[in-house]
Amino acid sequence: MLNVGDSVQIAGCSTKKRLLETSSGCDSFDTLIGGALVNSSIVLIDEYRSRCYGSYLIRSFLAEGLHHGHRCFIADPTEDPKEINLIPSRRTSTDMQNQEIPNSLPAENENSMKIAWRYGNVKQVSSSLGPLSNENQYDFTKHVENPNVDVYAEKVFTLKGIYETLCQIVKENEAHTKSGGRGGPKKNLLRVVLKNIDMEICEDYKFLGRFLCCLRSLARSSYMIVYITANSFRVPKPTWRILESAADTHIQLMPFDENEKKMFKHLGTAHGYFHLKSLPRLMSVGTHTPPILDLIFEASSRKGFQIRVMHLPPAFDEPAPGHQNTPSCQNIDF
């Protein structure tokens, strides 16, 4: 929260309820959490039984930062982060015009089905969240060349090393530190991505709880937003409870199993359930409450990451009102 007298202007950020906030790069996710990410937030992405769908949210997050000149940092204990070479580029006005539906529509067939007159004025149900265009503002088929992203590339991956590196970045030229009053160095937002934090590869993994407490304290005193990805399917409950306690916003991406894929064919190209486990804590006094929580997500290299409302198909086996299959009196034997 901004102190009295503070006047901070950072590209790509706005002030709401005396809180500095910025976009996550995914319109549907912004809509779900109330419009934008609040500064100093820690977002926990639970990639349940999978480690491929959270990458789309990370790439959107980094792409938004690069577009506005924010500083970006990423660390992954398993391998060199692949997201650096796959960060999508921002769509231009020309790209949006090329994707518009052409004016000349094909002539309707005489035998084509028409909607009943009684439903002619009824609005169509929209499953999308966010802008009505339902188009991602970033093109995942075109990638940013030579993105300016800091990568934690130490030979020995340790949580202590990550924290010390982040402290150095925050204090460098005082660009990301919160300072009261006007004047001083120009401020900028730091976007941090910590991938696969649940992997027990770090030498000091047993100090994960201490690391998260220090990270949260650092984020509260800085212009910083942190994304953390993990897989709760293989993490012990006490360890996962520590991760949940440190996060301000917690989401879970649960992919469909084989039976659910067959059952939910009507959902099209949806890949799984989107569970919003916890709302942003930094705005708990006046938090945004989503109108619906039955959500699904789609992650593709063409559309990026989209969150939609889950609509169940009609029950065709049930009889229509007024046509119940009740036996008539003449068919009853006495």
Swiss-Prot record:
Locations listed in the record: Cytoplasm; Nucleus
Gene Ontology annotations for the cellular component aspect, listed alphabetically: cytoplasm; elongator holoenzyme complex; transcription elongation factor complex
Molecular function per GO: phosphorylase kinase regulator activity
Highest taxon, organism lineage: Eukaryota
CDD domains tied to this protein: Elp4
Pathway recorded for this protein: tRNA modification; 5-methoxycarbonylmethyl-2-thiouridine-tRNA biosynthesis
Main localisation: cytoplasm
Job description of the protein: Component of the elongator complex which is required for multiple tRNA modifications, including mcm5U (5-methoxycarbonylmethyl uridine), mcm5s2U (5-methoxycarbonylmethyl-2-thiouridine), and ncm5U (5-carbamoylmethyl uridine). The elongator complex catalyzes the formation of carboxymethyluridine in the wobble base at position 34 in tRNAs.
Name under which the protein is recorded: Elongator complex protein 4
The species this protein was found in: Caenorhabditis elegans
